[in-house]
């Protein structure tokens, strides 16, 4: 493309190349819209077709996964690995197992992951992978056979210095263990090729908690910069998986009253707030094969909003921790009308572009996921460091490093987030992540 093109012409170029990849186009639009004024002031970043290269994955691997279920029936799923950018290190990003998984979603996640990983300051590139396999309702044997079948193709594309996957939606410690075990068998090599492993074979303490803890560390720093804090705040959390659980735990430690959790079927509301005992029971229920938030609500006699999200309730802080585009304009209007002070993304792109703009216009503090939920991948990087050194750190050391990294990410966002009274964290995160990746790409030439 001509180096003098406009923002809209660039976005149209991206849309035209992949007209059906709406999630990916949305992610590119969100990033480029905030970057464009910076790019106009720094024209070196529009040379050498850098932007065109940045929005095109270095490699996409697509393959079928053939496995046998418990009824001895042959099943066929699709799987992908998007190796988006290795400019600053090996590809790094999770594997997602969910029926909604497609190439557009994985490209959007890999694109976001590239900037998120850059923000951590650790030497990690960006990638993402997954399958339309649904682990819900499957036996452990079926999940194991699927993971092993998937690895018979994927293993040849991974390596400790090439591509290091981790977990994501539908992929927890069990699935990581199955995949890592098959990788070891096929490659005859025990080098670190997965993070989020069990502690018995190279995992890191605090890794399961890291995304949720990091979200709260970042949000607390954001609140403090603007004269507030979690202490005494009413908090709504969406989701009830790994990120939501540990965000609830850490927010409680900081003195917040967390009143909601949710899943795809509805929301539980506890006006008195979660306690350690209640949270432990929720985690136990969700760990069971068919555990739902509705079961937790029934057990404790709590309000259950069937088919609803938590955003209609009056709260001070909202932490969307479920899935992409869960918080739309209507939900944003409700939160703003009820006096929300801050929104921080625990999930990947859970807030639509329109809702994000609405929060910013209303003066609501807004922390984008690429900064706020970077704690998970940051601790994955720390797990890689421990594996490389053949060491295991104590939980306190990992947690302290995580806290420090999240404060560094917050500082980078503030540095690039404008000079007004209120920091534009979307702008700050996008520019800070972009500059690191772009400088590396320019230094390495046209490759």
Curated annotation (Swiss-Prot):
EC number from the UniProt entry: 1.4.1.4
Catalytic site positions: 128 (proton donor)
Site feature (Important for catalysis) residues: 168
Modes of activity regulation: Competitively inhibited by homoserine and by glutamine.
One Gene Ontology molecular-function label: identical protein binding
Gene Ontology BP annotations: glutamate biosynthetic process; glutamate metabolic process
Temperature dependence comment: The enzyme remains active when heat treated or when left at room temperature for several months but is inactivated by freezing.
Annotated keywords: NADP, Oxidoreductase
Outcome (variant: residue 128 to H): Reduces catalytic activity and increases pH optima for activity. Increases relative activity with amino acid substrates other than glutamate, especially L-norvaline
Summary of subunit composition and partner proteins: Homohexamer.
Protein name, UniProt field: NADP-specific glutamate dehydrogenase
Protein source organism: Escherichia coli (strain K12)
């Amino acid at each position: 493309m001509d180096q003098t093109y406009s923002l809209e012409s660039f976005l149209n170029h991206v849309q035209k190349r992949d007209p059906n990849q709406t999630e990916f186009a949305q992610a590119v639009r969100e990033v480029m819209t905030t970057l464009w004024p910076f790019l106009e002031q720094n024209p070196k970043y529009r040379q050498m077709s850098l932007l065109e290269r940045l929005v095109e994955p270095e490699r996409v691997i697509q393959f079928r996964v053939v496995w046998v279920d418990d009824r001895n029936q042959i099943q066929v799923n699709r799987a992908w690995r998007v190796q988006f950018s290795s400019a600053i290190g090996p590809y790094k990003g999770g594997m997602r197992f969910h029926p909604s998984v497609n190439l557009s979603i994985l490209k959007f996640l890999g694109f976001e992951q590239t900037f998120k990983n850059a923000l951590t300051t650790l030497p990690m590139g960006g990638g993402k992978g997954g399958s339309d396999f649904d682990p819900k309702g499957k036996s452990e044997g079926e999940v194991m056979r699927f993971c092993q079948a998937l690895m018979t193709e994927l293993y040849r594309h991974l390596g400790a210095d090439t591509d290091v996957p981790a977990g994501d939606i539908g992929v927890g410690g069990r699935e990581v263990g199955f995949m890592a075990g098959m990788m070891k068998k096929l490659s005859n090599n025990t080098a670190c090729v997965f993070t989020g492993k069990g502690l018995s074979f190279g995992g890191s303490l605090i890794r399961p908690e890291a995304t949720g803890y990091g979200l709260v560390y970042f949000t607390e720093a954001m609140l403090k910069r603007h004269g507030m804090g979690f202490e005494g705040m009413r908090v709504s959390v969406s989701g009830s998986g790994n990120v939501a659980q540990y965000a609830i735990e850490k927010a409680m430690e900081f003195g917040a009253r967390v009143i909601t959790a949710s899943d795809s079927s509805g929301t539980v509301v506890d006006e008195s707030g979660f306690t350690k005992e209640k949270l432990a029971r929720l985690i136990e229920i969700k760990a069971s094969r068919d555990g739902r938030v509705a079961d937790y609500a029934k057990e404790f006699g709590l309000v259950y909003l069937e088919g609803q999200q938590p955003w209609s309730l009056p709260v001070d802080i909202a932490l969307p921790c479920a899935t992409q585009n869960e918080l739309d304009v209507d939900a944003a209007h409700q939160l703003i009308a009820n006096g929300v002070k801050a929104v921080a993304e625990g999930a990947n792109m859970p807030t639509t572009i329109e809702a994000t703009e609405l929060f910013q216009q209303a003066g609501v503090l807004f922390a984008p996921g690429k900064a706020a939920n970077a704690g998970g991948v940051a601790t994955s990087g720390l797990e890689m460091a421990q594996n490389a050194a053949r060491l295991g750190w104590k939980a306190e050391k990992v947690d302290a490093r995580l806290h420090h990294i999240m404060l560094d990410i917050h500082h980078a966002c503030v540095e690039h987030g404008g000079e007004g009274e209120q920091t534009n964290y979307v702008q700050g995160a996008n520019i800070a992540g972009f500059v690191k990746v772009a400088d590396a790409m320019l230094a390495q030439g046209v490759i």
